[in-house]
Design a protein with these regions (language model features):
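Outer-membrane beta-barrel translocator domains and adjoining extracellular loop/strand segments
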Residues: 167-170
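Short strand->helix junction
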Residues: 172-173, 229
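Short coil/turn linking the two alpha-helices of tandem helical-hairpin repeats
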Residues: 157-158, 164, 201, 225-231
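Hydrophobic helical h-region of N-terminal Sec-dependent signal peptides
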Residues: 10-14
Length: 335
């Protein structure tokens, strides 16, 4: 019996000693491109982060700044929610730089530029071939990120006029440029990117990435608003880019036969859609809070929308007085 006990003790000692490994952690002070980019998957996970910010940027802050400052739309008080008079400030044009919707939009533009520039610089040093990809794909990724930089500067130009122009990723502050300088920078980025981006073919799906046609459409937007941005008429250039799009110069695009083409749940197959965001939320729950913003306070009850809440919905400003007579104001009358 004693011999058996000794054998068991010896066996357990051997088991414990063989199971002891060095569990000391190896600490890294930082994650660098050399340690992170080890596969095709890590490259794409890094690339799409700039695109997820682009998706976030299409939020209510941007919509309300564009609509509630136009004298056509407003958010009136229904119920207890007034949100610290933020909607009234937009209505009467007396907002401050720290107005929540304004602050988030300024931050969103800068964050988008910073992300895209940093991603472009880090991916420029990655050996795509060693990870099973091509140099052509690398060049395409570089131009997609450059187009994202142009997109965010275009949005900043539209909201604020001249923006601080960054050409590389840096923590140093740069002074604010003029609207014309910002316009020229956006144009420069897009003109350089368009010929190097991939063209859409008829068999391609829209999966959120950037192609020639999308960058060309952004350039057309830039030219269309040039007179407002900097007092220069660029309608001829805008018309030419649009005609080139219709003629297929920048890839395969066609107008759909009916409304459901670009707005159905499988619109990634649409011939008309040029840039879209992938979503698995087929019931629209991903953006339900945005839908609430455009409905009446009790719309959820009328439509039996489970999970929706009551919100002060944005609506057209009234064009008629309570007695039915039209208002005489020159602004603020949608019809």
């Amino acid at each position: 019996m004693r011999r058996n006990i000794l054998i068991i003790i010896s066996f357990l000692t051997l088991l414990v000693s063989s199971g002891c490994t060095n569990l000391d952690e190896k600490w890294y002070s930082e994650v660098t491109p050399d340690t992170y980019f080890t596969s095709k998957e890590t490259v794409y996970s890094f690339l799409v982060r700039s695109f997820t910010h682009w998706r976030w940027f299409h939020g209510f802050d941007r919509a309300i700044l564009q609509e509630c400052t136009t004298d056509e739309m407003c958010v009136t008080q229904k119920g207890i929610h007034y949100n610290d008079v933020r909607y009234s400030q937009l209505q009467h044009h007396d907002w401050t730089p720290l107005h929540p919707n304004n602050e988030e939009t300024w931050r969103g533009v800068g964050m988008g530029v910073a992300m895209a520039l940093a991603c472009k610089e880090d991916l420029s040093g990655v050996d795509y071939v060693s990870l099973g990809m091509t140099e052509e794909l690398k060049a395409d990724h570089q131009m997609q990120l450059q187009t994202l930089v142009a997109y965010f500067y275009l949005r900043g130009l539209d909201f604020y006029g001249g923006m601080p122009i960054y050409r590389r990723s840096t923590t140093e502050e740069v002074p604010r440029s003029t609207a014309r300088e910002t316009f020229n920078y956006v144009e420069e980025l897009l003109l350089a990117a368009i010929p190097k981006l991939e063209k859409k073919r008829a068999d391609m799906l829209e999966e959120g990435y950037l192609r020639q046609g999308t960058a060309a459409a952004l350039l057309a937007q830039l030219y269309f608003n040039a007179e407002v941005y900097m007092g220069e008429n660029r309608f001829a250039e805008c018309a030419q880019v649009c005609q080139d799009l219709l003629d297929g110069k920048y890839g395969y695009y066609e107008l759909e036969e009916d409304w459901f083409g670009p707005f159905t749940f499988d619109n990634n197959k649409s011939k008309e859609v040029m840039w879209s965001v992938q979503s698995q939320y087929a019931k629209g729950t991903l953006f339900q809070w945005q839908f609430e913003r455009y409905n009446h306070y009790n719309a959820k009850n009328y439509f039996d929308l489970s999970g929706y809440s009551s919100t002060n919905g944005m609506h057209l400003q009234p064009s008629l007085k309570p007695n039915g007579d039209p208002y005489t104001d020159k602004l603020g009358r949608p019809f």
